[in-house]
Swiss-Prot record:
Native species: Stenotrophomonas maltophilia (strain K279a)
Pfam families (alphabetical): DUF480 (PF04337)
Similarity-based family: Belongs to the UPF0502 family.
Protein name according to UniProt: UPF0502 protein Smlt0097
Length: 217
């Protein structure tokens, strides 16, 4: 990649499309044996109750429709098979991203505004950053390309939080205030490491349940 800040045309996504795109990136790394994902597996991933903000309840028809829309936008690709159609993401190729940038965007698609520390901790199963500078550089490149934004700090927040712009411009002040009032953010918790490990274990259980559902289906 060059130092140019030009970005390929970026289609705006709705909330369901954004969730599913993030899931495809995540599951490529965490469940490679069942990737690309079937519609059922994508639905299970999208509706996980851990590592998701907000928690959603998307029906199978809406999942299939959103996946087809992502394919039409060039952000996903369908694989046909005799048993079930499967989908893979094309986020990295479509937007000419590095792996690091792709992972950061996926986390923001799945979990909303996060600090640099949260992004680094939560990315470990997808990409292990060499150090904080590597992650910060990837964030700066995404900012230059207008793919994410730094949110203004709400009262009591000690760190900057970042949000993707794949669903369009955001009201940074309102989003930051809502995030603060909800008590979100592991960096402000008493034991952020423990909270994140619990979330990872719960996500692993959800992935196993999704794989079992796929085998039964």
């Amino acid at each position: 990649m060059t130092d140019s800040v030009q970005t390929p045309d970026v289609p705006l996504l709705d909330a369901v499309q954004a969730r599913l795109l993030g899931c495809l990136v995540e599951k490529e790394a965490t469940t490679p044996d069942t990737y690309p994902l079937t519609v059922n597996a994508a639905q299970s991933a999208a509706n996980q109750k851990t590592a998701r903000e907000p928690v959603m309840n998307i029906d199978a028809g809406s999942v299939q429709h959103a996946l087809r829309q992502l394919e039409a936008l060039g952000l996903a690709r369908q694989h046909f098979s005799s048993r079930a159609d499967r989908y893979e993401h094309r986020l990295q190729a479509a937007l000419d991203l590095t792996r690091q940038q792709t992972v950061l965007l996926a986390l923001l698609l799945l979990r909303g505004p996060q600090t640099l520390g949260e992004l680094i901790t939560r990315s470990e199963r997808l990409h292990r950053f060499a150090d904080t500078d590597e992650a910060r550089h990837a964030i700066e490149r995404l900012q230059q390309r207008a793919l994410l934004v730094v949110l203004p700090r709400a009262s009591g927040q000690r760190e900057d939080r970042y949000m993707h712009l794949l669903c369009g411009e955001v009201d940074g002040a309102a989003l930051a205030a809502r995030y603060a009032s909800s008590g979100g953010g592991s960096s402000d918790a008493a034991d952020p490491g423990l909270a994140e490990r619990v979330a990872q274990l719960e996500a692993a259980v959800a992935e196993l349940q999704a794989q079992l559902a796929e085998l039964r289906g």
